[in-house]
């Protein structure tokens, strides 16, 4: 297709100047891993978010000296690693799977036995998202725990960013979306990023509504109630407390390591 100079000028006249000159990168939000296929080819960086609790636990683990985490989507894969002698954790529906010693509580990874070790982990939602996104150019882990350091790092990369919310069993949830909205709000505030999807706009406004009191805002959210019923209140408070670490876990050759 050849466009003549006169035709190009006509096109330019019909478009706003900002549409022609806009060189900003995109930051968008995907609510669930089930929707990822609609976004995957447009973004160089994918931020996987599972606030309650997988990505929070992963950040806590690296903050406490773990060497690497191998995320796997199924309990069967985690069990195979355990049989080979690996420290292996498995969580389903908020509880530790029978036969495993730990799940996805961030406090589990603060024990001395984890320092310098390579650990295998499978969870209901977070490791599924990591598996879905594994072929992206760059995959990093996001949570409230590393919110500021991650947002600043993303701003420096000059790449399109997708926040992939893990949700709950392929359904929307509030806490992941609010965290994604916080990242989106920061990146847009730099002037280097823009977003056009309604999911991103919704995430940003949810964040702005919740930012002064995450715990209070999420008191009636489905997953917070689910974990509260399992007596995991301390986990909830910890996971909703921002900026407790400066680590950014990144996926390299199938393993999460510290950036």
Regions found by a protein language model. Name each.
Residues 1-20:
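N-terminal amphipathic/basic-hydrophobic helices that include classical n-h-c signal peptides
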Residues 15, 101-128, 132-138, 152, ...:
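Long, charged alpha-helical interface segments
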Residues 19-24, 29-51:
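Non-transmembrane, aqueous-exposed alpha-helical and coiled segments at domain scale
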Residues 26-28, 44-47, 67-70, 85-89, ...:
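Structural motif
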Residues 29-39, 54-66, 76-119, 123, ...:
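Residues that scaffold, gate, or flank divalent-cation-dependent active/transport sites
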Residues 123-125, 143, 163-167:
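Short, structured patches in soluble enzyme cores that scaffold and shape functional sites
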Residues 153-161:
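Glycine-rich phosphate/diphosphate-binding loops that line cofactor/substrate pockets in enzymes
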Residues 166-176:
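Phosphate/ribose-phosphate-bearing ligand recognition and processing surfaces
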